[in-house]
Amino acid sequence: MNFDRARKKMVQEQIATRGITDRRVLDAMLKTPRHIFVQEAMAAQAYSDSSLPVGEKQTISQPYTVALMTELLELTGREKVLEIGTGSGYQTAILAALADRVYTVERIRPLALRARKCLDSLRLFNVMLRINDSEGSPIGWDEEAPFDAIIVTAGAPAVPQVLTDQLAVDGRLVIPVGDEREQRLVKIVRKNDGTLETTTSIGCRFVPLIGRQGW
């Protein structure tokens, strides 16, 4: 299979034609090999318009969803970004191509170790990965806050205040919010006066966020 050709087709037909216009996001997805982040047996499906299982009851998100969430973060290349839920590491790699520094947290150790290996193979050394497998631990990376952008790759019942507290002024948080079966993408922006501006985007379905801020 020609992965380069499949990746180009993915960007053109699944992402650009559905309204993603940020050239930097499109370029990052064109250059990032999604197939190395999926199980070897599923490599041929890596550029399909769907999420795929990556083990440990977790999934790699649909390419369009990755592109949309990334575009909503409005990254320029100077940001410090927090990712909750490293998963396969694919979303992390896209962020690393678009931001100055990425801090990513994963609760499932085998996933985190596989993701780290993939990220290192791409020489993405601006990624700091933490394994936080304690159920009672607070969400986020408080000692490195504030963050210019925060992305959550699991569905939550509400926007966790502990994350909005870690946003810098003008910082953006993108998170799926809803119930365990269906959510909507929510974008939060922290304004100069400390208030939070909320907008809602498309419906989506993510694995549930686990812990005190989830289920």
Swiss-Prot record:
Enzyme active site: S61
Record's keyword terms, sorted: Cytoplasm, Methyltransferase, S-adenosyl-L-methionine, Transferase
EC number: 2.1.1.77
GO cellular component, one term: cytoplasm
Pfam family, one: PCMT
SUPFAM superfamilies xref list: S-adenosyl-L-methionine-dependent methyltransferases
Task of the protein: Catalyzes the methyl esterification of L-isoaspartyl residues in peptides and proteins that result from spontaneous decomposition of normal L-aspartyl and L-asparaginyl residues. It plays a role in the repair and/or degradation of damaged proteins.
Protein name: Protein-L-isoaspartate O-methyltransferase 1
Classification of source organism: Bacteria, Pseudomonadati, Thermodesulfobacteriota, Desulfuromonadia, Desulfuromonadales
